[in-house]
Amino acid sequence: MYKRATLILYNSYDKKRWHEAHKRAIARAAPVCYAYDFNLAIMDFPCKKEDLNNINTTIGNEGSYLKELIDKNRFFIVDKFLPQFGIPIATTSKPEKSKEITPIDTVKLLKNRPIGLFVGLGRHGLPKDILRFCKYHLDITEKGVSLETCTAIGIIPSTIYWLSKSF
């Protein structure tokens, strides 16, 4: 039995205004998290829970997967990393050698502890303070390939989920 993984979308867009890009990132991540048994957290987003009721989108079955996550207490709006997220892991195509972890070793961690996987939104990815804070850095491709945010949102939970099925 594995512990729970949380996909943490870190807002590196505008921290003051609630943009369409924020809404679409949540709408894209919710069905992926639902499908692959991940929690979803948004960090440093300029919104409240009520704002999420107004996400009208054709992505994610019109928001039904986000609603499912909310109803099951598997969606979090946070301004800092919560202890229940477990081990903080930054997802990056340029992992620091001393913090580098493979996808397989990430799954092995999940046998004993929950993990929180940060994904940076926007062109700049995760800021240096988050990279320093994280215990590990995961390059999901293991090849240094930089993935577009939406691609990473899909690939990371999928890879972790399917690898966990092979142990």
Where are these regions (language model features)?
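Short, Lys/Arg-enriched, disordered terminal segments
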Residues: 1-3, 105-108, 112, 166-167
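Secondary-structure boundary/capping motif
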Residues: 17-18, 50-51, 99, 126, ...
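Short secondary-structure transition/capping segments
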Residues: 52-56, 102-103, 150-152
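Long, charge-patterned amphipathic alpha-helical coiled-coil/hairpin "stalk" segments used as oligomerization
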Residues: 97-130, 140
